[in-house]
Regions:
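A contiguous, surface-exposed recognition patch within enzymatic or periplasmic domains that forms
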Residues: 1-45, 53
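Long, contiguous interaction/recruitment modules in multidomain scaffold/adaptor proteins
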Residues: 61-162, 334-345, 403-432
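Residue-level recognition of tetratricopeptide repeat
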Residues: 163, 172, 197, 206, 231, 240, 265, 274, ...
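Structural marker of alpha-solenoid helical repeat scaffolds
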Residues: 193, 227, 261, 295, ...
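TPR alpha-solenoid repeat register
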Residues: 200, 234, 268, 302, ...
């Protein structure tokens, strides 16, 4: 009820619909099951229809069709069914067992009105149920299983995950989870066993391309092609990495073979179209786009290329029609809106792009036009974008491509601007920053610390951590901008001395910033300086008019440190004073409250204060609303129940037996009683 009590509407509990094409919402452990994570194919667009089946009052669901949801069950003498129709239905309901008719009746059903009936039947043969001649169920009459549809639900226990294929599967699945460091680790293990494992080479080439290592990606793709010249992924990566590396002839060769594979055909034709545009071959580009659209008619990339080609080749009516069609499908298609705006003489997008980081949309579109060789459009978009150093760097670089003018004199001016809300994330931006640094150095100008910072956070984003650290260490103590030191501390988290110095510097620069206090206290805790952590937290909490969220974030952190040093009662009192708004999956506050109560109760039991201990064990089982966690239907109270029994009968053997079945953290809470 905790969520319902906080809702501003009045129509009861809400439902969160989750859409998807897969059998389940895969988690990390799904790697070791048959239900792997799935990645998107490049430039792929997929559409599907979903049917939702409310089963209110049916008791369950056995089968579903586009007409209705059906629930079957057995009694000793009857077959009973519930039908929940998703539309008004009229027709003959026929039930057969082993081709012998059991039931035949005309029925009229209303949408979502539960229909229940039964027929005498004690057999266990094959059941067939139809409504108005259309199938509702066809399967076993006792288990209600539909024959020959069982899908394997567990992986074979004797599958060798350390085999070449097992290592490859792990690496590929981690890549699909976007856990790229782990993906590289497991693919590397596979390639150590077999340096010419073609699928692993392709996946590794893809990871290297993402990191901006185009030459290395191309080398791995070529290594795979030395084994199989027609491998689809390796050819596509040969095209993609060579295109980024500037080897357009090699790129065309890779794409030309990749089009043999349906999975990469549309993307490869799109790449060929981009190269044709850069070479000024408008007819060739249009031909490639048409082939891409023939395979993927809904591909945004191909549709954008087509409408741009129409506009650039003076076919305004076709361009307008293509842009309007794209906007009808997706009103947030800013590429189409820009194309339509250019045609109408009003290419202004500022009133349509209203997200938190609008400049990123402009950069994304500008890079798309640059890749197609349309530098004038790229520059026009960048000039519309909100002020931001990355926007200005791209604009300067694009202007240089158009006019070949001198740009070094503006780079330092751009780079000395505030780095607020600057988050370079694209591998293309890594090469822009590297070019910029080289140009400044060549012209004898100093390189502002902001450039090293941008390059460092981008390298970190691309999992090139050692290079990122080099960029940060090159900066030293020059910045007076506190977030720089918070980021540095996070990057160097495992190097405690560097992280601690960075956090101290951040707090010195912004003593009133709660984040500096919170992160420095966390660091103190990691090096067993709990008292120092409590001291700086209390200094902040003693300030007046703190926002509620600051009070509960630092208050909960204080309670954790109090538990760490054994001040359980004080921790409980702090938790009682907090007000934590619930958020999905957040259970840390309640877990801490429960832990504090259990640890204090154990301490009281150890000291013979049974009555007081029982009070805190009862409190550990409560779910105070101020802690933001709603009580589950079946809370796990095994530990508190066992401790209550121990408080009464002092049977240490029974307590040990229960505790051994619990997680290690739970066992640690009662160590002083059973060691």
């Amino acid at each position: 009820m905790i969520w319902e009590n906080l809702l501003t509407d009045t129509d009861g509990q809400y439902v969160e619909l989750q859409s998807g094409r897969l059998f389940n919402q895969a988690s990390g452990g799904s790697t070791l099951s048959p239900f792997k994570h799935i990645s998107f194919a490049p430039y792929a667009v997929d559409t599907w229809t979903e049917n939702w089946y409310p089963v209110r009052k049916t008791g369950g669901i056995t089968a579903a069709t586009e007409m209705a949801a059906l629930y079957l069950r057995r009694t000793p003498t009857h077959l009973v069914w519930n039908i929940s129709p998703v539309a008004d239905l009229n027709g003959e309901l026929v039930i057969k067992a082993d081709n012998k008719e059991l039931f035949n009746q005309n029925i009229a059903l209303k949408t979502l009105v539960n229909y229940i009936d039964s027929v005498r039947y004690a057999g266990n043969g094959h059941l067939n149920i139809t409504l108005d001649g259309r199938p509702l169920f066809d399967g076993h009459g006792e288990s209600f299983a539909i024959e020959n549809t069982a899908r394997p639900l567990v992986s074979p226990p004797d599958f060798d995950w350390e085999s070449e294929y097992g290592l490859y599967l792990k690496g590929k699945d981690f890549a699909s989870q976007r856990q790229f460091v782990l993906a590289e680790e497991w693919l590397g293990k596979c390639l150590t066993k077999n340096p010419y494992h073609v699928p692993a080479l392709g996946e590794m080439a893809q990871l290297l391309h993402r990191k901006g290592l185009y030459k290395e990606s191309l080398d791995l793709a070529n290594k795979a092609l030395s084994v199989n010249t027609y491998d689809p992924l390796a050819n596509y990566l040969r095209g993609l990495s060579a295109q980024q590396y500037g080897l357009l002839t090699v790129a065309k060769d890779g794409y030309a073979v990749a089009v043999l594979s349906p999975a990469y055909r549309a993307a490869a034709f799109t790449g060929l179209a981009q190269i044709a545009l850069r070479e000024g071959d408008w007819g060739g580009a249009e031909g490639f786009v048409e082939k891409a659209l023939a395979h993927q008619p809904a591909s945004d990339h191909s549709r954008h290329l087509q409408m741009m080609i129409f506009r650039k080749t003076q076919r305004s009516d076709q361009a307008r029609l293509a842009a309007e069609s794209a906007l009808a499908d997706n009103p947030l298609d800013h590429f189409a809106r820009y194309e339509l705006g250019v045609l109408n003489g009003k290419p202004e997008l500022t009133k349509y792009i209203t997200n938190e980081l609008p400049h990123e949309d402009y950069i994304e579109m500008a890079l798309w036009y640059r890749e197609a060789g349309q530098y004038d459009d790229a520059l026009a978009l960048l000039k519309q974008a909100p002020e931001n150093p990355m926007v200005e760097l791209w604009a300067s670089d694009t202007q240089h491509l158009i006019s070949q003018g001198n740009k070094e004199n503006v780079l330092s001016q751009i780079l000395t601007k505030s780095p607020e809300f600057v988050f370079p994330s694209r591998h293309e931006e890594l090469h822009l920053l590297t070019r910029t640094e080289n140009e400044l150095t060549k012209s004898g100008q100093p390189v502002p610390w902001q450039l090293h910072y941008y390059r460092g956070i981008l390298l970190w984003q691309l999992d090139r951590v050692s290079e990122a650290k080099e960029s940060f260490m090159a900066i030293g103590e020059a910045p007076k901008w506190p977030p720089f030191y918070l980021v540095k501390a996070d990057l160097f988290e495992e190097q405690k001395e560097i992280a601690g110095q960075a956090l101290e510097r951040a707090r010195a620069l912004s003593p009133d910033d709660w984040r500096s206090v919170h992160l420095l206290a966390t660091h103190y805790g990691s090096v067993n300086k709990n008292e120092e952590a409590l001291s700086i937290i209390d200094q902040k909490l003693n300030q007046k008019n703190l926002p509620v969220y600051v009070q509960y974030i630092l208050g909960q952190q204080k309670a954790r440190f109090l538990v760490n040093i054994g001040k359980y009662r004080e921790s409980i009192q702090v938790m009682k004073q907090l007000t934590i708004l619930p958020n999905e999956g957040a259970a840390a506050a309640h877990n801490l409250f429960r832990e504090g109560n259990i640890r204090y109760a154990v301490e009281l039991l150890k000291n013979g204060k049974t009555k007081d201990a029982l009070t805190y064990l009862d409190q550990a089982e409560t779910w105070p609303e101020n802690l933001g966690s709603g009580q589950p239907y079946k809370p796990d109270n095994r530990l508190t129940t066992a401790l209550k029994a121990y408080a009464v009968d002092k049977k240490e053997t029974d307590l040990k037996k229960t505790v051994q079945e619990l997680p290690e953290k739970e066992q640690n809470m009662v160590k002083i009683l059973i060691d």
